[in-house]
């Protein structure tokens, strides 16, 4: 199973926030996920991002790939 760390969209129309989720790469964007490891809210004045770095490091160590957007948000 190829795992990927990517964003899943939540929120209302024109007011999104995103969960940072570990999921199977074959699932759809908002499909099932294995674990939620954080969230990102781009709609507030100061964009807030919360990530559980311990779990992020774990998933990277077992071979999960990060999407380009998650790399940019987390600064890795």
UniProtKB/Swiss-Prot annotation:
GO terms (BP aspect): translation
Annotated keywords: Ribonucleoprotein, Ribosomal protein
PROSITE patterns given in the database record: RIBOSOMAL_S16 (PS00732)
Any Pfam family: Ribosomal_S16
Gene3D superfamilies from the UniProt entry: 3.30.1320.10
Lineage top rank: taxon: Bacteria
SUPFAM superfamilies in UniProt: Ribosomal protein S16
Any one GO CC term of the record: small ribosomal subunit
Keyword Ribosomal protein listed: yes
Ribosomal protein as UniProt keyword: yes
Annotated disulfide bonds: none
Sample GO molecular function, one term: structural constituent of ribosome
InterPro entries: Ribosomal_bS16, Ribosomal_bS16_CS, Ribosomal_bS16_dom_sf
NCBIfam families for this protein: S16
Family statement: Belongs to the bacterial ribosomal protein bS16 family.
Protein's name in the database: Small ribosomal subunit protein bS16
Organism: Sulfurimonas denitrificans (strain ATCC 33889 / DSM 1251)
């Amino acid at each position: 199973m190829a795992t990927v760390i990517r964003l899943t969209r939540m929120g209302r129309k024109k007011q999104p926030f995103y969960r940072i989720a570990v999921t199977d790469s074959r699932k759809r964007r908002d499909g099932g996920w294995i674990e939620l490891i954080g969230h990102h809210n781009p709609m507030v004045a100061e964009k807030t991002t919360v990530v559980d770095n311990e779990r992020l490091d774990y998933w990277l160590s077992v071979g999960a790939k990060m999407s380009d957007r998650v790399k940019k948000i987390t600064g890795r």
